[in-house]
Amino acid sequence: GLLDTLKNMAINAAKGAGQSVLNTLSCKLSKTC
């Protein structure tokens, strides 16, 4: 239903945000930016 769709969108958005934060952190730590 609609709620499931919204929930999945929220989960995917959170995963995407977390991934970019992790990428930024590892990039800064290894100085590959």
From Swiss-Prot:
Chief site of localization: secreted
Cited Pfam families: Antimicrobial_2
Cross-referenced InterPro entries: Antimicrobial_frog_2
Disulfide bonding pattern of the chain: C27-C33
Subcellular location, record wording: Secreted
GO BP terms, alphabetized: defense response to bacterium
Cellular compartments per GO CC: extracellular region
Keyword terms: Amphibian defense peptide, Antibiotic, Antimicrobial, Disulfide bond, Secreted
Signal peptide range: none
Tissue specificity annotation: Expressed by the skin glands.
UniProt function note: Has antibacterial activity against the Gram-positive bacterium S.aureus ATCC 25923 and the Gram-negative bacterium E.coli ATCC 25726.
Family note: Belongs to the frog skin active peptide (FSAP) family. Brevinin subfamily.
Name of the molecule in the record: Brevinin-2HSb
